């Protein structure tokens, strides 16, 4: 019985440890945002569209493929992720959303929201989770573990995939 309890506790702790970090408090973002997200892994490339908008006390994140078919929808309310709609859970999208929240946090609010964050010129990181290399404040590459990169740019009519 005790062995079963220990296994359950270990599973619970590992589930908590796998959650991507969130800011101490919600940063001030210029919402709504429409972004083109290019997912890159080894020699695979995939385009997504992301809409981030304020909804009440929370922030809604809607990820779609280029045809507008939903890939993932989440709401961040009171520093907790909540499913939005009937889509199944998508851990990769939740990790992406948390990384984007880190990348989009204004410089003046970064260390208050992410005390372990490091900055150097056009590079921002939160080891071991994410690294962000900025070309401009709205054009950047997110590097996540397992050789996964996301090139993020504002969505414009000219830049639509």
Task: Locate each region found by the language model.
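Bacterial N-terminal signal peptides that target proteins for export
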Residues: 1-8
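C-terminal motif of bacterial Sec signal peptides marking the signal peptidase cleavage site
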Residues: 12-15
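N-terminal secretory signal peptides
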Residues: 21-78
């Amino acid at each position: 019985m005790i062995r079963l309890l220990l296994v359950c506790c270990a599973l619970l702790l590992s589930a908590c440890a796998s959650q991507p970090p969130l800011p101490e408090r919600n940063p001030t973002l210029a919402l709504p945002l429409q972004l083109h997200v290019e997912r890159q892994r080894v020699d695979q490339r995939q385009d997504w569209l992301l809409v981030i908008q304020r909804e009440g006390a929370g922030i809604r994140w809607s990820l779609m493929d280029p045809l507008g078919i939903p890939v993932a929808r989440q709401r961040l309310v009171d520093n907790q992720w909540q499913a939005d709609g009937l889509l199944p859970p998508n851990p990769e999208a939740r990790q992406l959303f948390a990384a984007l929240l880190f990348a989009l946090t204004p410089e003046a609010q970064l260390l208050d929201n992410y005390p372990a964050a490091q900055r150097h010129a056009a590079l921002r990181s939160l080891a071991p989770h994410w690294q962000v290399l900025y070309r401009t404040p709205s054009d950047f590459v997110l590097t996540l573990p397992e050789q996964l990169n996301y090139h993020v740019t504002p969505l414009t009519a000219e830049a639509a995939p």
